[in-house]
A protein has these predicted regions:
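Acidic-and-aromatic substrate-binding clefts and catalytic sites of carbohydrate-active enzymes
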Residues: 43-48
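A short acidic/basic microdomain associated with nuclease active sites
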Residues: 39-41
Length: 260
């Protein structure tokens, strides 16, 4: 299942919930009828990252459920985010050229950290690997906003793990000043923003980012955290008879879905 964007393109690769109890979150997703991947622990070229995840793989994109497991700087950043709320704190863009994105972000003042070689072993010992571009939290305060390149995508999108008929379609950003925040995200993403009613959309080759005020997002989603934050995401469905609806997720996960 080809998830890698074409040269010169970007996609909405995944979003992530930061949660205190990985297994409780996974159980709640399984009760909702989803296939959840087994747990695996992250590591970088410097050693254990201190977090583990389980994932919902879709036909396009995926949702990561991530929990801190150790006392590392990375795990502490996750815990700090969860002090505000349990829910969606990460938005990742897929790229075929992470080094080029790193250079572009540096040129635009985002001060990216050195390229990270992220990996984790699946339950059967098979490694999955990524190149990841992070920026300091102050540069993108809405969450952990990053780029990644998949190096072993066939191992992640295994036939038995894919939740068929679903695609990751949009991520929602809460902004005190939607125009200003959308302009910054547009520079980060290298795309042109466009106004859509109460929102500003940032379209990608696959998926999009939607920026709006808290009031506008509450009208759309039913709830939204204070700015700056990520409010939730949208899944598009190819399932027959699926009507567009907003789903409030269990407290173990936090956040909301727009699905349909």
């Amino acid at each position: 299942m080809d998830q890698r964007p074409a040269p010169g393109e970007l996609c909405l690769d995944h979003v992530a919930h930061f949660v205190p109890d990985l297994q409780a979150a996974a159980r709640d997703l399984e009760k909702l009828g989803f296939v959840v991947t087994p747990e695996s622990a992250h590591r970088t070229q410097h050693g254990p990252a201190g977090t583990s995840n389980r994932c919902l793989m879709f036909e396009q994109g995926y949702v990561e459920i991530l929990a801190p497991t150790m006392d590392t700087p990375n795990a502490q950043r996750v815990r700090e985010r969860m002090k505000s709320f349990v829910g969606v704190h990460l938005c990742c863009f897929g790229t075929p050229a992470p080094a080029a994105e790193h250079a572009r972000l540096a040129a635009h003042g985002f001060e990216p950290e050195p390229l990270v070689n992220l990996a984790r072993n699946l339950q059967d010992g098979t490694p999955v690997k990524f190149n990841v571009v992070y920026v300091p939290p102050a540069k993108m305060p809405e969450g952990r906003i990053q780029y990644c390149e998949h190096l072993t995508e066939s191992q992640m999108w295994r036939e038995g793990w894919v939740n068929r008929g679903l695609r990751l379609d949009a991520a929602y950003v809460v902004a005190a000043d939607p125009a200003e925040v959308a302009a910054r995200w547009a520079r980060f993403m290298g795309v042109l923003p466009r106004r859509d009613g109460d929102f500003v959309e940032l379209p990608l080759a696959r998926g999009k980012v939607v920026v709006g005020s808290r009031a506008a997002l509450v009208r759309l989603l039913g709830e939204a955290p204070p700015a700056p934050a990520l409010a939730g995401y949208a899944l598009s469905s190819a399932r027959p008879g699926e009507k567009r609806r907003v789903v409030k997720l269990p407290p173990s996960l936090g956040g909301v879905w727009v699905i349909g």
